Amino acid sequence: MDKKEYIIRQLGRTKNKKYEAYVVTRIIHLLNDFTIKFVTQQYVTRPEGRALTDLYFPQFGLHIEVDEGQHFNSVNIEADKLREVDIVNATGHKIIRVDVTKTFEEINFQVNEIIEKIQQMKLNSSFVSWDIDSEFDPQTYIKKGYIDIADSVAFKTIKDACNCFGHNYNGYQRAGASHPDPDILLWFPKLYPNGEWDNQISSDEAVIIERNEDKDKAKIHITSHLEDKEKYKHKRIVFARVKGSLGDVLYRF
């Protein structure tokens, strides 16, 4: 997918909400800077719970919410389905609300203020231009020599994540892979119901619960991990399988 396709599809997600569509498209068109990445209708988790923000700029940790005078952004989606989507931890992020109950001129004034704010943030930060080709490329992180959760690292395939850690796979589909440190496992879980497994992540994203719904198999699984620590690694680097904003599969660090 190139930038043109990405941008058109992102803007197309707002078409069923007239005020959101107006504000979001006006911001993007007036900003006119495609070194800046944006995501529409981004699921986020905050200390007070999960929500849906209308426009997200990941390079700045900035969220724009279109306020129509009602709390329409709360997440109204089945819990199991929500567990599949790519959710951004917005703790510490900045949120700007656009009040569309005001006059047309006042709405446009708010948008202009947002444009100025983004341009200033770009000048005041160690800004890295959005490169749609390199952001999912393992070579990007191999050259850096590290990955950091603050960089929102994700890969399109399991093999790409594995290749960041010394592998040279052309394809790989298993949920676990070796790491140069023999005490560490690369793990690619689905954090939603998947066959007999129902893995979950806590609301604060601090703990992953690995659970088999078959009680006998669950007991064997737990006992094996406790008794054979040479075979079963207790330290894991996790890339969870999620659905990206455009429905694509990603493995998010």
Predicted regions span which residues?
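Compact beta-sheet-dominated globular domain cores
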Residues: 252-253
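Polar/acidic, low-complexity leader/linker segments enriched in S/T/G and N/D
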Residues: 129-158
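Acidic, glycine-rich low-complexity segments with interspersed aromatic residues
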Residues: 149-249
